[in-house]
Amino acid sequence: MTGSQSSAQTVAVFTSDVQDAIDSMQQLQTDVDGLRGDVESEVGYSVDKINSLLKRIHELNGTVASATGLGKNIGGAADQRMSAIEELSGLISVNVRDQPDGRVTIETVNGAVLLDKKLRQLSYANGGASASQPTYPNIDIRFAEDSGAMGAATGEKLDSAAVGGKLGGLLDLRDRALPAFSEQMGVLFSGLSEALNAVSNAGSTVPPPASLDGRQTGLVGSDRLGFTGAATFAVTKADGTLVAKTSIDFGAMPANATIDDMVTAINAGLGGGATASFTDGKLSIKANGAGNGVVVAQNEANPSARAGVGVSQYFGLNDMVRSDSNSLVPSGLAAGDAHGFATGETAQIVLRDATGRALTSYTLSPATGGTVGDLVSELNASPLGDFGDFSLDDRGRMRFEPTGALSGATLSIPSDSTDRFGTGRGFTAMLGLTGASSGLENAQVRPEVLASPGKLPLARFQENAVVGAKALGAGDTRGATAFVDKLASTLDLGKDGKTTIERFSSLLLGRAGLEASQANDNLLDAAARRDDAVNRRDSFSGVNIDEELAQMVILQNSYSAAARVISTASEMYDTLLNMV
């Protein structure tokens, strides 16, 4: 992409590679959702099997207790019960205790009773529906009739990987491992899209586009402008000759300046060369005059910035990557800004510990006319605030810092009906509390950029150019080097710290591979311990083949000796008869 004869092909390969990367991330997200659906089906099957085994063990308990009371042999029923318990222990970790009457009681490792003299069954409202869902119901323990018909709840539940066994592993996958991977994939996409768009918005195509049409920001014209630094808005001819320009120093504007004030300043500065408008949360600038185009450039000495990104990138005027569900930049909202949500709109927030167990949840209910700071206060005063602190960082992102004892705790937002001033942007997308709201699901490289390499903005505006002089050059590909440099630079990923795209992706995929390897090792270790326990049990209470073989040899020798004695006695008897 540096001006060689093959630069168009190189640009085409680059844009195609970016789209392929986005497609791969989207496919991974789809695969994760599919896996969660498969795991959910297995959860349902496992619950049904556990219930069947508990019922079987309960029936055999009665048989063994009755036979014990009558002094009868219990071997057959006890062996069947042991087989059922062994199968149950593979599905869930249990503690089994023998009782004086011959029965056994069964508890989970956390002490929840599954079986004593009264049968209990697991109640799972979801029934193992084979679809990925934002949240899943708890598995409740209920008293049950001998027939298996469920009654009242015991008040105990199975809700995390701590239950152990196959069921615990499934819950860990469904509620922790897979959602965490998906959330981190969203963070990776956020960093990638912000880096790519930072470079594309700093450049321009030659000829420049007749209009720059921004994406949805979630803002309205009366919102605080919030920019520092300066930017240049210009109009050029198709060959890059400057027609008009205006430099806006945001720092010199009043402290209470609004987005509408910026639009007014742009229009006044360009003197009819172009028309800017801000409608329904989107900024657009359209050149006036046939063949003219629009350029927005950063001031090199004092670049414009809100939430750490320039004015063109913030409004998405020249993005390379777009998403219909996210603005792809931090909001830049401050505590005193209006949150823009209406009474009756809500967002459900769930907090889970490092094992995936839901600790608590809260439904955020903003009041009309409130501020972003009010949202922070409401969350800190909620049950969620008992487990950590909410705050707003300098880029307008909501942050949650769990208490030290809850390291690894995560938040999720299963449902969100909020809508900031009717723009279609809600609490989740505006404040970026989790990476799951990154907009990855419908992101893409702009179709016109994919279709035509010349639509990728690689040229840089000559800030000191005067009207009538060349401000853009057709052979200028400085943006190509900028893409390389930006993708290799350190990025601010919010709660996930500052790192490079390469390092973050390597850690993410490496962590997934490591967890898979550890899970396999744990499986092998558990299988070895199980086999050892079974062998020791069988040696103690079952048939030891070596010992029995030795006994048979002794018996055979005894039989042979007895046979010889009998044979000798027979011969003596015959001799006596002959003597008579």
What is each residue range found by the language model?
Residues 1-580:
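Structural signature of extracellular appendage/secretion-system components
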